């Protein structure tokens, strides 16, 4: 699935964050260990998305993020830390840079730690 600014705007309209959708402001940076924990938790809840560069309080403005300038580096870092692949997409939204972590669901009968 190609993630577009329009898709981000649809997600922003959500009334609240869910087990499968997290918004994080992360204007300048985001703790990698915290990111790994979010990836594991979302995988265990059936998969979903983490968006960096979007305020988590409504109206969920795009604030942009400078976190993880090396997308390939964080992609491999996540795999090495948690043992499964997370797709990382950088979107140039008109209001700022947004990074989306698309977390797959864990295989049935297993749990990630």
Question: Language-model features: where?
Answer:
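Conserved N-terminal catalytic/coupling substructures associated with nucleotide/phosphate chemistry
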Residues: 1-113
């Amino acid at each position: 699935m190609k993630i577009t600014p329009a898709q981000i705007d649809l997600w922003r309209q959500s009334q609240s964050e869910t087990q499968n959708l997290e918004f994080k402001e992360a204007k300048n940076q985001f703790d990698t260990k915290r990111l790994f924990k979010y990836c594991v938790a979302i995988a265990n809840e059936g998969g979903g998305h983490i968006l960096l560069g979007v305020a988590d309080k409504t109206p969920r403005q795009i604030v942009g993020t400078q976190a993880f300038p090396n997308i390939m580096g964080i992609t491999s870092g996540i795999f090495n830390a948690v043992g499964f692949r997370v797709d990382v997409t950088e979107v140039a939204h008109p209001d700022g840079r947004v990074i989306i972590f698309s977390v797959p669901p864990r295989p049935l009968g297993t749990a990630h730690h």
